[in-house]
Amino acid sequence: KYAKEKGLTVIVTDHHLPADALPEADFVVNPNQHGDDFPSKALCGAGVMFYLLLATRSALREMGVYSRVPQPNLLTLIDLVALATIADVVPLDRNNRIIVTKGIERIRQNKLQSGLSALLKVAGRNCFDISATELAFSVAPRINAAGRLSTNDLGVYCLISADAPTAFDFAQKLEELNKERKVKEREMQQDALSSIGTLDDPEAPAICLYDPTWHSGIVGLVASRIKDSYYRPTIAFAPSTEEGREGEIKGSGRSINGIHLRDTLDLINKNHPGLILKFGGHSLAAGLTIKEKDLPVFEKAFKKAVLKNAPSGTFVKNTLVDGELAPSDFTMSVANAIDSIVWGPSFPEPIFANRFVVKNQKLLKDTHLKLDLEMDGVAVSAIWFRRKKPLPERAYLAYKICVNQWAGRRTLQLVIEDMEDEEERLL
């Protein structure tokens, strides 16, 4: 609005589901706005901008501009578009898989931006055998740490730095912020778990959490952890730090299959006008702002809306598996074949299930369960992330076959996803 008042032409790009009222811009570029026939609806924000650049280049080509100046090679940006696609956890439809695959190809050829190269170095990762999983868990959190605790500028400056030394300086600053983020996240997660222990109804259809000491940039991570632990849609709130927004709290939510979080917030907004000051998001993740004094009303409305729209069996976590494997399948060739494919939302990595003998188990960093398993005389290493409770001597486990890279070595490792017991079923 300010730019329009100053006489500037304003172009807004977005990829979220649009609100009823669009921004006051000259052009709104969003494949998800009503009436837009662009076929790729699952693009992340960087993906939308990439296609806008492609369209702009095409228009300039038709105008004859490139008869006078060199045509830019936009493929040099595909590593950043791939990183953004992975980091934003958008559905990996056919087009997004192509983007990520091409981006990883260039990274493995060492044809990547200086900023991404610097981030891989501080993360201790090698560009020549990088995977989508490593970009998701090693690079993306370091970029996001800036926006969570400081300002997004640091991440942007790192990624657009043209020279390696400058990019590495920014990457090191992001590394320090990420370490700080981990500490704060652990503290907030412990607070959240303690709060849930005092809730009136631990079996409620949804969870709302708020602490005046929490950081608004980290509540989404807390909501994600609690959602995973309790398998309930979860929204975590923290005080707004924006000037002039005193008395408001910002929430970040994560949902489960069967509960569309943004549509749930939209229903609450229609039934309780003015309760939600602003909101937006997707089916599994959303953000919102409300007044602190309205939290009890919102919590009641949220649980009611979730329960109303929950299909039968929504709150029972079932792990779908692709079948059992033979001990002879536990090889690096199988692991490498699976690792070579780009997996993600809407294109999930295969999960297998077998009965194992648990030979040894120990906690790593008091957080992850490291396992030595055996099946029909074949030994295999495994890990269960964020699992502290020990396993029985024999267990029927759901798992992914992964390549573990550590100290320059690549080894096969099972990543445990679930265990069959009386409460959870493997289908």
Where on the chain are the PLM-derived regions?
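Short alpha-helices
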Residues: 24-65, 74-83, 281
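Accessory interdomain/linker segments of ATP-dependent helicases and helicase-like nucleic-acid enzymes
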Residues: 316-380
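OB-fold single-stranded nucleic acid-binding module
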Residues: 294-300, 394-427
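Hydrophobic helix-and-loop "lid/oligomerization" segment in the mid-to-C-terminal part
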Residues: 6-7, 58-294, 300, 320, ...
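Single-stranded nucleic-acid-binding OB-fold domains
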Residues: 360-365, 384-389, 402-413
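Short, ordered loop/turn segments at secondary-structure junctions
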Residues: 15-18, 27, 32-34, 212-213, ...
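Beta-strand/loop nucleic-acid-binding surfaces
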Residues: 265, 376-390
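N-terminal small/polar loop signature for handling phosphorylated ligands or for N-terminal nucleophile
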Residues: 1-23, 28-31, 187-195, 227, ...
